[in-house]
């Protein structure tokens, strides 16, 4: 069962990510909570996107709040990222950017 508090935090932070980096070049998946497309570049419309980032909610929220760095999480195997544009390090953390 999905925790409603974590669900809200994941959805709000992903919405802010999309606001900061509009587009459809990267698919960010935080199962089982949400998935979004963001980032400038070639638009994805069908099938598996060329650029995919997937991680659990705990890792995502740690990145959002600056409790973990992208490179560290990637090196620890907490992030599954494929594709040339599958890197959100320049956008994280989001803690000071999330709208109230």
Feature map (PLM): residue ranges:
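Feature captures hydrophobic
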Residues: 1-100
């Amino acid at each position: 069962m999905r925790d409603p508090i974590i669900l809200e935090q994941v959805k709000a932070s992903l919405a802010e990510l999309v606001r900061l980096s509009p587009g459809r070049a990267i698919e960010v998946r935080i199962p089982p909570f949400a998935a979004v497309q963001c980032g400038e570049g070639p638009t994805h419309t069908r099938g598996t996107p060329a650029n995919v980032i997937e991680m659990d909610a705990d890792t995502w929220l740690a990145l959002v709040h600056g409790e973990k760095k992208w490179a560290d999480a990637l090196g620890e195997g907490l992030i599954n990222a494929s594709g040339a544009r599958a890197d959100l390090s320049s956008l994280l953390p989001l803690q000071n950017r999330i709208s109230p």
